[in-house]
From Swiss-Prot:
It is found in: Secreted. Belongs to the neurotoxin 04 (omega-agtx) family. 03 (type II/III omega-agtx) subfamily. Expressed by the venom gland. Its main location: secreted. Keywords: Calcium channel impairing toxin, Disulfide bond, Ion channel impairing toxin, Knottin, Neurotoxin, Presynaptic neurotoxin, Secreted, Toxin, Voltage-gated calcium channel impairing toxin. Pfam families: Toxin_34. The keyword Metal-binding does not apply. This is Omega-agatoxin-Aa3a. GO terms for cellular component: extracellular region; host cell presynaptic membrane. Omega-agatoxin are antagonist of voltage-gated calcium channels. They block insect neuromuscular transmission presynaptically. Potent blocker of N- (Cav2.2/CACNA1B) and L-type (Cav1/CACNA1) calcium channels. The lineage of its organism: Eukaryota, Metazoa, Ecdysozoa, Arthropoda, Chelicerata. The presence of a 'disulfide through disulfide knot' structurally defines this protein as a knottin. One of its GO terms (molecular function) is toxin activity.
């Protein structure tokens, strides 16, 4: 149930939703707490790497495998 790039995402869940192609949920923040215009967007490589690491740590039902790193660490 990944969301296509440009698709609407839930700002309450912010980065915790799965967006296709290493995307993440980006919102406009109004007055620091109201979020609007939330869409799945493609970030730079550095942005999505950081967001994916945060997502893996913070999101309750996160699936870090959805963060397709270009340099995946080798499994031992």
């Amino acid at each position: 149930s990944c969301i296509d790039i440009g698709g609407d995402c839930d700002g309450e869940k912010d980065d915790c939703q799965c967006c296709r192609r290493n995307g993440y949920c980006s919102c406009y923040s109004l007055f620091g707490y109201l979020k609007s215009g939330c869409k799945c967007v493609v970030g730079t490589s550095a942005e999505f790497q950081g967001i994916c690491r945060r997502k893996a740590r913070q999101c309750y039902n996160s699936d870090p495998d959805k963060c397709e790193s270009h340099n995946k660490p080798k499994r031992r």
